[in-house]
Amino acid sequence: MMIKPPLSLSRITSAVAFPAMIMAWAVAGLHLPAADLQGCRDERSYAVFDALFLQRNNASISRPVVVSSTAPSAAVLGAADPVSTIGTGARATYGSYGEEDLGWEVGYLGVYGMHAARAVSDPAGTLQAADPVFAQQTGLIDGFGAWMTNDSQINSLEANFVMHEYDGGFNRRSGRPWQRVDWYDGGHIDWLAGFRWANLYDTATLAIPPGASTTPSTYAAQATSNLFAAQLGTRGRLAFERWAFEGWMKIGIAGTALSQSQSLVDALSQTPFRRPTSSDTAGMGMIADMNLSAIYRLDDVWGLRVGYNLIWLTGVALAADQWDFSPNPAGGTALQGTGSVFLNGANLGLEARW
């Protein structure tokens, strides 16, 4: 079965390139007075809080979920059709560079309220689940309307060792052109190595009211994915009198613990065709995290942040992938764990460095 890619390469490239161009313009064109800033210094501790506004791009297995009984080979509604709303969340990081530029940091990331829905209708009442025999056995048949919902949330914790390299700040003789700019205040590169845990909780429901019934027959699935990753990354920062620019990239190879459960409710029968089932398995996956941010420096400690993010989880179990439309009462126990989730969107927050 084909996997629908989360985003085209051109869209991903554009999403990163646009904020980068804005930052380049800001560096070249903005030279604001900053008499209250002390000049070149290498802060030793930092705390960051960002509000997140991220949209999930579904990468479910591309397959029919709802068809018409008059054309059962053509999808009326596909598993990957619903488009998610923008989820809100938070990211918090605290760290210290230590005495010898060998430090640590801890962080949390959470994204909530990612909701997707898609509804279809047919005045002839021919809508049914993808397999006609399964549809007859479960009451997912003869629908004038059908809808699918998908809800998910992500939580992540990480702890990293940090190796810090500071460039010394303004230097008229430096071979780096940005260090020769009069209003340059200092830059650094951090090398990160650590551990990251991420949890994806995903639910999906298919509903079809059979015939004239006002109560829908439903097929619900829940999937949980825990990723335990060894993580490497790098973070760079350039600070000027009033503006600073920061970007990072982190990637972790993860072992995964996956589980799923599902249940059917037949509006036409009190005896379920298939009892609730569940299963679990282990596998491998990946966590990738990228950010590009601009910071307006309020004073020597505080700054306002705005930026753009890309987050990618692979090797996860997606709820819609767990639906088993086979006409087998013992079905619904196989776990599909090859899904991926791609998030992109903005961050807005506050930082302190001292």
Question: Which functions belong to the PLM regions below?
Answer:
Residues H31-G110:
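Short glycine/proline- and aromatic-enriched beta-strand/turn motifs that initiate or cap beta-hairpins
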Residues E43-S45, E100-W104, N155, D185-W191, ...:
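Outer-envelope beta-barrel architecture signal
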Residues A47-F49, Y94, W104-V106, W191-F195, ...:
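Membrane-embedded beta-strand positions of outer-membrane beta-barrel proteins
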Residues F53, N160-F161, S340-W354:
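Outer-membrane beta-barrel "beta-signal"
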Residues F53-N57, G110-M114, E165, F195-Y201, ...:
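Transmembrane beta-strands of outer-membrane beta-barrel pores
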Residues S60-T85, G113-I154, L200-N226, T256-G285, ...:
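Extracellular/periplasm-exposed beta-strand and loop segments of Gram-negative cell-envelope proteins
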Residues G78-V120, S156-E158, H188-D190, R196-N199, ...:
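Glycine- and aromatic-enriched membrane insertion/assembly motifs of diderm outer-membrane
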Residues S96, M163-E165, G236-L238, A294-Y296, ...:
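Residue-level signature of outer-membrane beta-barrel architecture
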